[in-house]
């Protein structure tokens, strides 16, 4: 029996929202099918933070590992989706406490009723204390359906610094609009980009049974 899949990755295209000043997605055709050419070949340019992505420690730590040198285990396995819809600007412990019993090692928080298709300067982020408590419970990956686990205006990146210190991994820009609260299998592997500070992922959830 085939287990149901939920695609939790947004479409990546020229209109995909990016942090102000970041590199948007663009594509050009280097070759097209026609006389003397049997294939279409394109070149793409984008920030690795466009769409669903995994941050590497290098993104928030000058001496951190690049995404191509990060262990993959955290990005694959049992996961819990917790709803904190409309909560913010920070997701506090009280917003997720109803669903933290017997947590698996991966937690994704849904804050949007419907994910926006344009940049959201007022995005919801994790409160650093929430990340600390999740780490205390053995969580090794956190994710969110906004562009960052820190507020868009943050210069200190307090929640990123918690995951640096506690050794957690992170997924951002997920789409959880159609996902009920509960437990799933997460599959969200980053590319082996040897020197990059992040990587796009094709994030999916799979039913446990």
From Swiss-Prot:
Pathway: Amino-acid degradation; L-tryptophan degradation via kynurenine pathway; L-kynurenine from L-tryptophan: step 2/2. Substrate binds at residue 19. Zn(2+) 1 binds at residues 49, 53, 55, 172. Zn(2+) 2 binds at residues 55, 160, 172. Binds 2 zinc ions per subunit. The keyword Lipid biosynthesis does not apply. GO terms for biological process: anthranilate metabolic process; L-tryptophan catabolic process to kynurenine. It is an enzyme of class 3 (hydrolase). Keywords: Hydrolase, Metal-binding, Tryptophan catabolism, Zinc. It holds the Pfam family Cyclase. SUPFAM superfamilies: Putative cyclase (SSF102198). Its cofactor is Zn(2+). The keyword Thylakoid does not apply. The active site is at residue 59. One of its GO terms (molecular function) is formamidase activity. It catalyses: N-formyl-L-kynurenine + H2O = L-kynurenine + formate + H(+). Its EC number is 3.5.1.9. Catalyzes the hydrolysis of N-formyl-L-kynurenine to L-kynurenine, the second step in the kynurenine pathway of tryptophan degradation. Homodimer. HAMAP family: KynB. Belongs to the Cyclase 1 superfamily. KynB family. This is Kynurenine formamidase. It comes from Delftia acidovorans (strain DSM 14801 / SPH-1). The gene is kynB.
């Amino acid at each position: 029996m085939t287990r149901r899949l939920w695609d939790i990755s947004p479409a990546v295209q020229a209109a995909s929202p990016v942090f102000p000043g970041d590199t948007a997605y663009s594509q050009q055709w280097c070759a097209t099918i026609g006389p003397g050419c049997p294939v279409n070949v394109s070149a793409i340019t984008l920030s690795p933070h466009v769409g669903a992505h995994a941050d590497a420690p290098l993104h928030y730590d000058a001496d951190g590992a690049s995404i191509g040198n990060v262990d993959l285990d955290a990005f694959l396995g049992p996961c819990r989706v917790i709803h904190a819809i409309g909560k913010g600007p920070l997701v506090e412990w009280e917003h997720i406490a109803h669903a933290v019993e017997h947590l698996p090692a991966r937690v994704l928080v849904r804050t949007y009723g419907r994910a926006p298709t344009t940049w959201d300067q007022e995005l919801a982020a994790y409160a650093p204390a929430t990340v600390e408590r999740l780490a205390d419970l053995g969580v090794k990956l956190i994710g969110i359906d906004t562009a960052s686990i820190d507020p868009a205006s943050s210069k200190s990146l307090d929640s990123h610094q918690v995951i640096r210190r506690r050794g957690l991994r992170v997924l951002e820009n997920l789409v959880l609009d159609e996902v009920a609260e509960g437990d799933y299998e997460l599959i969200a592997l980053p590319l082996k980009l040897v020197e990059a500070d992040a990587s796009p992922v094709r994030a999916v959830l799979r039913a446990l049974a």
